[in-house]
């Protein structure tokens, strides 16, 4: 049967990895065996073992690729922005959904030592990217000269909390609306600015 349908079994490595990525970032890895993965992917176990020696290593490999792609998406969005303030907004919007990893996948990643390091490295890279954009905003005279590390940590900390489903349910907000309002708060502050006097 396989011989008569070569196209059905000869997915490119890129297409195969894309399908595998979707499976693992949706389901996580703790509930799956290599055998179940092979069955779901309609492939041999050997093809999975060619990527990594264990299911945990396979999962971490996939997650690392997703996180790196997510960072690059954020940087690309920032590069297209006309100034530093809009670059920060574009960067955060582009990295909005914590990489597309489901709650199950994030939980599994946190439970694996190498997975925690991968995610910590990703968060650190996000902070560093944000810091450089804030520094550029100060140089452009668009932002007040606050400590860039403090501001970037505050933004990322809030981003983590704003994704919380309980918070979103309690406020009745959608995640995109919550982030938009938060960015407005960061860029414009809490204080009402007096209107310019009419001539």
Can you describe what each PLM-predicted range is?
Residues 11-40:
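Short, amphipathic alpha-helix enriched in basic
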Residues 1-3, 128-139, 164, 171-199:
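C-terminal peripheral helix-coil segments that are non-catalytic and often amphipathic
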Residues 68-71, 115-140, 149-154, 164, ...:
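Amphipathic alpha-helical packing segments from all-alpha helical-bundle domains
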Residues 61, 72-101, 151-155:
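Hydrophobic alpha-helical connector segments
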Residues 107-116:
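Short linear capping/connector segments at secondary-structure termini
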Residues 87, 93-96, 144-165, 177-189:
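Hydrophobic alpha-helical segments that form the core
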Residues 25-29, 42, 49-61:
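HTH DNA-binding helix-turn interface
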């Amino acid at each position: 049967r396989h011989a008569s349908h070569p196209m059905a079994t000869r997915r490119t490595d890129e297409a195969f990895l894309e399908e595998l990525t979707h499976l693992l970032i949706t389901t996580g890895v703790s509930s799956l065996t290599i055998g179940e993965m092979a069955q779901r992917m309609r492939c041999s176990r050997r093809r999975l073992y060619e990527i990594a020696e264990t299911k945990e290593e396979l999962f971490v490999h996939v997650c690392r690729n997703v996180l790196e792609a997510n960072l690059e998406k954020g940087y690309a969005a920032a590069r297209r922005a006309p100034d530093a303030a809009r670059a920060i907004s574009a960067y955060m919007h582009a990295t909005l959904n914590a990489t597309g990893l489901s709650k199950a996948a994030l939980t599994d990643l946190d439970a694996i030592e190498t997975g925690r390091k991968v995610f910590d490295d990703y968060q650190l890279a996000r902070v560093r990217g944000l810091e450089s954009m804030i520094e550029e905003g100060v140089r452009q005279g668009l932002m007040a000269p606050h400590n860039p590390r403090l501001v970037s940590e505050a933004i990322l900390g809030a981003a983590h909390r704003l994704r919380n489903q309980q918070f979103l349910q309690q406020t009745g907000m959608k995640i995109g609306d919550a982030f938009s309002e938060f960015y407005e708060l960061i860029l414009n502050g809490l204080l009402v600015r007096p209107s310019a006097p009419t001539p």
